[in-house]
Amino acid sequence: MTNYDVIEAYAEDFTKWAYRNSRGTVKITNNTIVITNVVETNNIIEDDKEPYSDLTIRVTGVTENKYLIVRQGRGKPEAYIKKDGVYTFKDNNLYFGFGVSVIGECNITITQLPTSILKDFSGNKHDAYLYGFKGKLNSGVGIYAQDFKNWSYGSTINNDISTKSYNKFHIVKKKADNWFGFTIGIPKNNYYNQSYKLKFNINKKIDDINFSIVSTDGNLITTAAYSVYINDGSIIDVPIISEEIFNNKEETNIYYDLGTNKDIEIDVELIADYPNQLCYDGKSYAVAYGLPILTDYTVIADRTWFAEKVDNGVFMSKALEQNGAFILEYKQGDKWNTYSYYSATNINIDKDNSIVYQTKNKYNEQTIYPGDKQDTDTLFIGTIRKDDSRSFNGCHGDILIFNRTLTEYELSWVKNNMMCSKQQEPDIDL
C-alpha cells in the first residue's frame, strides 16, 4: 500500500448523473443518493455518459417489499437489493442506475464507498474504507516530517528535468559546471521544524561533498543551521533547527545547500517514521461494514498512540449507539478506559509496547468487566464512530480480530507468527 492508495477518492460523481425528476424525488451529492419519493419504477437517476466505473455502494432503507432496483442497458439483468448492506457492481454500462420497486414515499440511501481501502488479508472480504487520509505528512503510510511537493528549486537547478514528490527530489543542474548552491528551499512558515532522516543517492562516484541546511533571506543574509559531509548512500539525521536561528525574521526561508560543482545528479529521499504503518492525524479514519456479530472475541493490534496530541480519543471501536463488542482504548485527558459490550473499565496503558490485545474479559493482563449490550456489524478504526470528534492520532500495523477468547498459548503464537512487526519471542507453552 502506498500513500497514493490511501487518499480518499471515488469512482463516480453522482451530481453528473442524469436525474429523471419526472420519475421521482432524489437528493444528490457527489457520493450519496437519497430517494424520498417514487412516481414510476424506472431508473430515477442513471449514468448516461462514459466512463462507466465499477462501483461499491452501501444501501440502507430497503425491505423485502420496498427494494432498490439496479438496472442498466445492453442486455444486463436487473439486480434487486432487499437488504441493507454493501454491494459491488462491475463492468457497468450505459444507463446504470437506480429505481425502486414500489410507487410512493420512501427513504432509501445509496452511499458510494471510497476506492481507498485497507485490505482484509483474512480472505473474509471485510475491507475497511478509508476516509480523510491525505497521503502525506502524518496522514497516510508512514509519517513524513516534510512535504517536498511544496518546496521550490533554486536558480541553478533545471526545473524541466528535476522532479519532486512528497518524499523525494531528483536534482539536475542547468549547466554541468554550475555550483548547486541553494538547491531547494521553502518559506519557514511551511517548514516543519522537527528531526527527520534523509537519504542521498548520487549517480557518479565522487569525493564527499558538504550538505548544509541554511536559514536565509535568499540573497545576502544566511546562517548555517546544520552541516555534514555526504556521499552516495549516506543517511543523515537532520536535527531541529535552534529557535534563535529559526525565529530570525530577516531570514525567511530554509534551503538545502549542496557545496559542489561536480557534474552529478542527486536524489534526496525523506525517510518515513513508522514505515509500512497507516498513520492517522485525528481527522482520518477507516470503516469496515458487514462484520460478524460477536458474542465473544479477541482483538490484537500493533498500534502506537501519539497520546500527547489527543485529549479525547479512541483507537478502534464497534460502537453504534449504545451497542458494540468493544471500544478499544478510550483516552479522556489523563484517564484511559476500555469497553467490552459497552461496559467501561479503567486501564493502564503500556506505552513501551505497541502490541495490545483485548478479550471479552481482559485488556492485556488486566481484568475488565463486560456489559450485556449487543454487538454491531461495523468496525471503526481511528474513531469511536463516524462523524465523531473522538479520534485517534497515531499509527498501526496489523489488526487481527477473532470470534472467541484465545488461550495464552494462542495469544503468544499469534504475536510471534501473525504480527509482522513483532520481534520473535518464545511461545508460552502451558
PLM-predicted stretches and their roles:
Residues M1-T32, C106-N178, I186-Y191, S195-S227, ...:
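Extracytoplasmic low-complexity segments
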Residues T367-G397:
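Extracellular glycan-interaction patches encoded by glycine-rich segments
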Residues I44-L55, I184-Y196, Y289-I300, I347-D352, ...:
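Extracellular/lumenal carbohydrate-interaction signature centered on repeated Trp-anchored short motifs
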Residues I221-I230, N337-S354:
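Short, aromatic/His-centered strand-loop micro-motif at the edge of beta-sheets
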Residues T88-N107, D237-K262, K360, D375-K386:
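Extracellular beta-strand ligand-recognition surfaces/modules
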Residues N312-Y339:
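Glycan-recognition/cleft segments
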Residues R58-T63, K199-K205, D302-K309, S317, ...:
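Solvent-exposed strand-to-loop "edge" motifs in beta-rich extracellular domains
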Residues N348-K373:
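Carbohydrate-binding surfaces in secreted/extracellular proteins
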